[in-house]
Amino acid sequence: MLIIAGLGNPGGKYAGNRHNIGFMAVDAIHRRHSFSPWSKKFRAEIAEGELGGEKVLLIKPQTFMNLSGEAVGEAMRFYKLQPADLVAIYDELDLPAGKARLKTGGGHGGHNGIKSLDAHCGKEYRRLRLGIGHPGIKEMVQNHVLGDFAKADKAWLEPLLDTLADNADMLVRNEDSQLMNKIALALGGKAEEEKPRKDNKTTEKKPAGQSHIHQARNHNQPKVLTTGPMADILKKMFGNKGE
């Protein structure tokens, strides 16, 4: 079983905030796939369904952002799950708008929702960070995060959420790099280059049944001198062996 937790603040007042992009992502997955209607449990809104043949619980904590870990931790204990069974989706100031990054573990980066998850759920869970951009000035961060997305943001926000929802089964299959490439391409970026495969270098095959030493002895042996001054000296020293 996998828990996909979208982080945000509850209530209509915060629904369109940049800080609520985690809620938006989970809502998009819920709409795209066959999940149960939202219900209330664990101080959260939850919905059950399947992705990629595995049972999945979508969860939106209703505790407000700073206490998100209390709700998610309660659900994890109920289902006896480990940090590896959790994916958290949340906003990231330090990523340009529309960029996404997915990794296991790491720091909280000053995100209070992640601080709470770390405290209540452990740290080795997967973190899907969705970039909302930085306003450029520290004093503007709070208004930026708790401000609504602008109309112009729809140009990247909608394809980001749609692509994530369309390929949510990749989260279950741990196809993290493939999912990141899908999102990058949908936003007009470039997929990350795959690591080059090692060339299958052709090596000289050794004859069957022969050791490396035996091969070396039979390979390009120097010619024995039979004539000339050096040959005469060798004959005087060692005699005519082998003749």
Swiss-Prot record:
It catalyses: an N-acyl-L-alpha-aminoacyl-tRNA + H2O = an N-acyl-L-amino acid + a tRNA + H(+). Residues 188-243 are annotated as: Disordered. Residues 190-207 have a biased composition (Basic and acidic residues). Pfam families: Pept_tRNA_hydro. Keywords: Cytoplasm, Hydrolase, RNA-binding, tRNA-binding. It is an enzyme of class 3 (hydrolase). GO terms for biological process: protein quality control for misfolded or incompletely synthesized proteins; rescue of stalled ribosome. GO terms for cellular component: cytoplasm. It comes from the Bacteria. It is found in: Cytoplasm. Belongs to the PTH family. NCBIfam families: pth. Monomer. This is Peptidyl-tRNA hydrolase.
